[in-house]
Each structure stands twice: as structure tokens, then as C-alpha cells.
């Protein structure tokens, strides 16, 4: 068996920016002294005159990005999720969100898989913070192919976009000729009739593996990748819930305010359904190797399999 190709979506971000930069002179990239980590250094090397290092001043970076947007530029402001969504939240809300400016926020190192950097750098709340800002699009791609497509879609969309990327290399699962990325549209990766599992980001590949284990036990799981958490694919959520009668959500984020909450918001109004949310259960993270943390917090394939099996019984 050939080895599965793995790429960190932060790498995809840097590479996609270069691809877009070659086509669009109005694209600028801002960073806050973390270009080597966010991988905007790839763009910086290719287009040094269009890369702005704002230093360790994330709030200022967002303000600069907002100003550039008013001048017709398309700025991608980049930092770790903890700083882009956390430290700079007020500026994102009031300077970008309120006037609905065409600013893109590239947030890397999101979730528990930041690993050894520990709880202070593991942003488990960013989706919740960003999806509540009126007019903000929130995207959490699952692999290299989807991340590149998401960056392109963000550029083409007129308005603020929050892009969530990871530090850890993840399997490429969308490497097929018919793959198509559409903002606000979920992707059915596996058909099933017993339970619908909605997942996003890093957890997509783990959920697919869990579904195979469930199938061996006679549980037919439908797996749906929700790359765009806002606007969310309400029609697909309702249809899958009605088809299976049981719903599970899986995310590398707090169970409060993230994908699980977004799915429940839809179902509460349109198709009340029993839901099991799998994610970080209202706790902070900790320092440790990323793969060990993913397992400890129950986001690996084996843990997902066990939780879904217990829920469906």
C-alpha cells in the first residue's frame, strides 16, 4: 500500500497565496512576526514588496488590513488563531466586521494539534468567536486541496473571511479530478443510513477512518465534510438528519459555539434530531505531542468510533 500523502494546511495557505499573487497585483499579505510559522514566508520570498510584517502587533495589523481594503486592495492578515481571533478580536469585529470590509484573515495553528506550545496557544474558541460576527464567512478546510481552493474562494468573495488552518500535516483526501469547492456547501464523503456524522478540518480524515470501523460492526455512517461553517449548508444538514434520524458532530474545537452548535442551531428550528457533539469538552488544552493530544481529547479515529457506536446503540 502506498503511503498516504500528508500536508499541513498552513503550508497550503502559503502556496495558495503565491498562486493568487501571480494573478492578482492587488493581493497583499500581512503578518505579525510569524511568517516562518504561518508560511506566508513562501509569499514573502516571491513577492517581498507585497508582504508587510507588522511585528508583534496583531491589532495594528488588522487595522492596516482594513485601511488597505478601503483602498481597493485585498489583504490577507495572518497570525496564529489565538492571536488573529483572540488578541485582535475587537479590531476584527469593529474595524473589519462592522464596516464589512474585504479583509481575509488567515489563522494558522488552530486547535489542540498545536501540540507542545500548550494551552495559551491552542485556540479552541475561534470558530465560535468568528461565526458570531455579522457577515463573517468562516472556513475550516480539511486538507491541502481544500485549503488551496478555500484561499482562492476567499479572494473571490467580496467581504470578510476567516480561514482556519492547522500546524499538523494531515492526509490529502480530496485529491480527485471531480473535487469542487463551493462556499456554504457541505461535501458528502461517504453515504450511510444509520447516522449522519458532520465533521470539519483535521477531524475529517479521522472520521472517515472511524466510519470504516463502524461499517465493520454493521453501522452505516454517512460522513459529511462541512468546510464552510458560516454560511452553513442548512439543506444538507436537514436532509441528512431526516434520512438517518441521528446526528454526530466532530471538531477540533470547543463543543460550545463551533460546528456542533451551528448544526444544532439548524436542527432545532428545522428538524429536531438527537445530536451527539464530539470535540473539546469545555476545558483548556495542554502541552504535548499533537498526536497524543488528539488521542487524549478523543478526536482520533478509534475514540470517534467508540463514541459514535455507543451513541447509535
PLM region spans:
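Thiamine diphosphate
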Residues: 1-164, 169, ...
Amino acid at each position: 500500500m502506498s503511503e498516504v500523502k500528508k500536508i499541513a494546511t498552513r503550508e497550503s495557505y502559503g502556496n495558495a497565496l503565491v498562486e493568487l499573487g501571480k494573478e492578482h497585483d492587488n493581493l497583499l499579505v500581512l503578518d505579525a512576526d510569524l511568517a516562518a510559522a504561518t508560511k506566508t514566508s513562501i509569499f514573502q520570498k516571491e513577492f517581498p514588496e507585497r508582504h508587510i510584517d507588522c511585528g508583534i502587533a496583531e491589532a495594528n495589523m488588522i487595522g492596516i488590513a482594513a485601511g488597505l481594503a478601503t483602498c481597493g486592495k485585498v489583504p490577507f492578515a495572518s497570525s496564529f488563531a489565538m492571536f488573529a481571533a483572540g488578541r485582535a478580536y475587537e479590531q476584527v469585529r469593529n474595524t473589519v466586521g462592522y464596516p464589512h470590509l474585504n479583509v481575509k484573515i488567515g489563522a494558522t495553528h488552530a486547535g489542540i494539534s498545536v501540540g507542545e506550545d500548550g494551552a495559551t496557544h491552542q485556540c479552541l474558541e475561534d470558530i465560535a468567536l468568528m461565526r458570531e460576527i455579522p457577515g463573517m464567512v468562516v472556513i475550516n478546510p480539511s486538507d491541502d486541496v481544500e485549503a488551496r481552493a478555500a484561499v482562492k474562494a476567499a479572494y473571490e468573495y467580496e467581504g470578510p473571511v476567516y480561514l482556519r488552518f492547522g500546524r499538523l500535516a494531515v492526509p490529502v483526501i480530496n485529491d480527485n479530478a471531480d473535487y469542487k469547492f463551493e462556499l456554504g456547501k457541505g461535501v458528502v464523503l461517504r453515504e450511510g443510513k444509520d447516522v449522519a456524522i458532520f465533521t470539519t478540518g483535521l477531524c475529517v480524515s479521522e472520521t472517515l477512518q472511524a466510519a470504516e470501523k463502524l461499517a465493520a460492526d454493521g453501522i452505516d455512517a454517512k460522513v459529511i465534510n462541512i468546510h464552510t461553517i458560516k454560511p452553513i449548508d442548512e439543506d444538507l444538514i436537514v436532509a441528512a438528519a431526516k434520512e438517518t434520524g441521528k446526528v454526530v458532530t466532530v471538531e477540533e474545537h470547543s463543543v460550545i459555539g463551533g460546528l456542533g452548535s451551528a448544526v444544532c442551531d439548524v436542527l432545532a428550528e428545522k428538524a429536531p434530531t438527537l445530536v451527539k457533539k464530539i470535540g473539546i469538552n469545555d476545558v483548556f488544552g495542554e502541552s504535548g505531542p499533537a498526536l497524543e493530544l488528539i488521542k487524549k481529547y478523543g478526536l482520533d479515529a478509534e475514540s470517534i468510533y467508540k463514541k459514535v457506536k455507543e451513541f447509535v446503540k
